[in-house]
Amino acid sequence: MTITTEDILDCANLSRLALDEKTAQNYAGNLDKILAMMDILDGVNTDNIKPLANIHEACNELRADIANSDIGRDGFQAVAPMVQDGLYLVPQVIE
């Protein structure tokens, strides 16, 4: 697949971007290089390669998802600057 200057200018027009001819030619050349690299990668035989979720062999150790109703609310409210009826009060910042 080849990206032409016309393709770039059409996309720029649809996107309401102002591009001159020289910039469009530069973009088309760069995109052609990128697509050429993708063609090279597409030709690599990956039949015996397992898909990876992570490039590192590390595994995340996750804790059990167990509901815990004790969040220590009384302890938090004891050190909060302002509390009223179990709610945290904060100063008004927008008038």
Curated annotation (Swiss-Prot):
Pfam family name, one: GatC
Q: Does the keyword Nuclease apply?
A: no
EC top class, as a word:
ligase
- What is the documented function of this protein? Allows the formation of correctly charged Asn-tRNA(Asn) or Gln-tRNA(Gln) through the transamidation of misacylated Asp-tRNA(Asn) or Glu-tRNA(Gln) in organisms which lack either or both of asparaginyl-tRNA or glutaminyl-tRNA synthetases. The reaction takes place in the presence of glutamine and ATP through an activated phospho-Asp-tRNA(Asn) or phospho-Glu-tRNA(Gln).
Which residues form each disulfide bond in the chain? none
Checking InterPro entries in the record gives:
Asp/Glu-ADT_sf_sub_c, GatC
Q: Which GO terms describe its molecular function?
A: asparaginyl-tRNA synthase (glutamine-hydrolyzing) activity; ATP binding; glutaminyl-tRNA synthase (glutamine-hydrolyzing) activity
Subunit organization: Heterotrimer of A, B and C subunits.
The entry's keywords: ATP-binding, Ligase, Nucleotide-binding, Protein biosynthesis
Q: Which Gene3D superfamilies match?
A: Glu-tRNAGln amidotransferase C subunit, N-terminal domain (1.10.20.60)
Question: What catalytic reaction does the record list?
Answer: L-glutamyl-tRNA(Gln) + L-glutamine + ATP + H2O = L-glutaminyl-tRNA(Gln) + L-glutamate + ADP + phosphate + H(+); L-aspartyl-tRNA(Asn) + L-glutamine + ATP + H2O = L-asparaginyl-tRNA(Asn) + L-glutamate + ADP + phosphate + 2 H(+)
- GO BP annotations listed: regulation of translational fidelity; translation
Q: What is this protein called?
A: Glutamyl-tRNA(Gln) amidotransferase subunit C
Question: Which organism was this protein described from?
Answer: Moraxella catarrhalis
Is this entry keyworded ATP-binding?
yes
**Entry EC no(s):** 6.3.5.-
Regarding protein family, the annotation reads:
Belongs to the GatC family.
